[in-house]
């Protein structure tokens, strides 16, 4: 997985940077380097998630509560949009009732969008700056990414794609589409 990715990135002329797996050192290095892409294991994303929550809650007294509310709104908004645009991991034919019902989901979207926008202004942009400010796509492999982390990062504007492969057979067999992600899945076979 890692070696195949390194060879590909070197082939296309991308600069590679390495850091220690300690989250505090990793976040400091990310601020210095401003990466656009990062391939890691789910444990690193879990550590980044915990560092984000710790950082937000330590800033002001009520910041943690507001961050939780705005994160909930952004996650709910993203989930509703996934249902509306048929980006769910259910693999059966949609009924007429489903198509009619999905149109009514625009109503809560209208009410949730301002909360997501406020959260983006005050919190989510700061979180993206913790990752260097230019971060575009994070790749997770080597284990299943917990759905909670997948929803969190995608809802605050950090796209994660999940890949699957065995080093012994084929380093990367499947990878999620970054433009139309279906959360909780590993995507199509390459």
Regions found by a protein language model. Give the residues of each.
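Conserved coil-to-alpha-helix start sites within the AMP-binding
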Residues: 1-12
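Conserved adenylate-forming
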Residues: 10-11, 17-190
């Amino acid at each position: 997985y890692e070696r195949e990715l390194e060879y590909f990135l070197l082939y296309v002329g991308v600069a590679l940077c390495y850091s220690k797996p300690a989250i505090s050192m990793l976040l400091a290095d990310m601020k210095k380097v401003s990466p656009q892409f990062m391939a890691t294991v789910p444990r690193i994303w879990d550590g980044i998630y915990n560092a984000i929550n710790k950082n937000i809650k330590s800033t002001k007294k009520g910041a943690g509560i507001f961050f939780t509310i705005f994160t909930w709104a952004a996650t709910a908004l993203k989930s509703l949009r996934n249902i509306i645009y048929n980006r769910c991991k259910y693999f059966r034919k949609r009924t007429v009732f489903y198509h009619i019902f999905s149109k009514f989901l625009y109503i809560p979207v209208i009410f949730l969008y301002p909360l997501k926008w406020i959260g983006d202004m005050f919190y989510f942009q700061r979180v993206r700056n913790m990752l260097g400010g230019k971060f575009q796509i994070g790749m997770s492999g080597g284990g299943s990414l917990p759905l909670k982390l997948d929803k969190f990062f995608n809802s605050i504007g950090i796209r994660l794609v999940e890949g699957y492969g065995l080093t012994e057979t084929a380093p990367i067999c499947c990878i999620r589409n970054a433009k139309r992600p279906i959360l909780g899945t590993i995507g199509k076979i390459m």
